[in-house]
Design a protein with these regions (language model features):
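Residue-level signal for inorganic ion chemistry
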Residues: 29, 62, 113, 151, ...
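Short active-site segment of divalent metal-dependent hydrolases/proteases
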Residues: 92-93, 97, 225
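Structural motif
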Residues: 86-87, 112
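Active-site segments that bind and position negatively charged phosphate/pyrophosphate groups
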Residues: 184-225
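ATP/NTP phosphate-donor binding region
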Residues: 1-83
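Glycine-rich beta-strand-to-loop/alpha-helix junction loops that act as flexible
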Residues: 56-57, 87-89, 220-221
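A glycine/threonine-rich phosphate-anchoring loop and its flanking beta-alpha core
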Residues: 98-184
């Protein structure tokens, strides 16, 4: 959706990724605070006031955190034509995408998913939102990113549990569509296979962008779970 997956940044190194984030000294970045510690070479050239780090925890997906993003965007005079770069896993992608979608009726959103689950699922398809009154994703909308840039080296610092979560989601897609390459749960897939699975979800979401028909097949296993 949007301009879709950006293959030119598949398997890119941190220097290339950093230069992408440093399109200018006006770049606006919202990122997982853990990534700031794990990949210090990616972020330093951006003026600190134009980076907002947030903890990647489910309790972050709240109105309070969303207001914090609004304040950050407002204080940096972000306009609808500005790119907002979001770097993180599902929590950060969900929350920041919702804030970007609703700030001034929507700015240009560029996602850099940092977990396997986000690369093949959370960052793809445009769903975004936050938790409310204890209900997960109770407030949300559809807002496809202009670009989704997959930096596969992020996977090198994932915990085994994070890999399992991602491969479990990929296995669900494989059960839905057996033309996809076979994967082995718990093993880190090759970058080309990650891209293949992300494209599969994008095809479904492009055909049914607002989850009214075909896209519901992606809920396979979720309701039972």
């Amino acid at each position: 959706l949007g301009n879709g997956l950006n293959e030119s940044y598949l398997n890119t190194d941190s220097i290339q990724l950093a230069s992408t984030l440093r399109l200018s000294d006006q770049s606006i970045v919202i990122a997982d605070s853990r990534l700031g510690q794990l990949y210090p070479d990616i972020f330093p050239a951006i003026v600190n006031s134009r980076i907002l780090f947030l903890p990647a925890a489910e309790h972050t997906k709240t109105l309070k955190s969303c207001r914090r993003i609004y304040d950050f965007l407002s204080s940096n005079n972000v306009n609808r034509s500005d790119d907002v770069h979001v770097v993180g896993g599902g929590v950060i992608c969900d929350l920041a995408s919702y804030a970007v979608a609703t700030f001034k009726r929507g700015c240009r959103l560029i996602l850099y998913p940092s977990t396997l689950l986000a690369m093949v699922d959370a960052a793809v398809g445009g769903k975004c939102g936050m938790n409310y009154r204890g209900i997960k994703n109770h407030i949300g909308t559809f807002y496809p990113a202009e670009k989704i840039i997959i930096y596969s080296a992020f996977l090198n610092t994932l915990k085994p549990q994070d890999i399992r979560q991602g491969t479990a989601e990929m296995l669900k897609s494989y059960l839905i569509c057996d033309r996809l390459s076979q994967i082995h749960p718990g093993d880190l897939p090759q970058s080309s296979i990650i891209l293949e699975y992300a494209r599969f979800k994008m095809e479904i979401c492009t055909a049914d962008p607002h989850d009214l028909g075909l896209r519901r097949i992606l809920n396979f296993g979720h309701t039972f779970g």
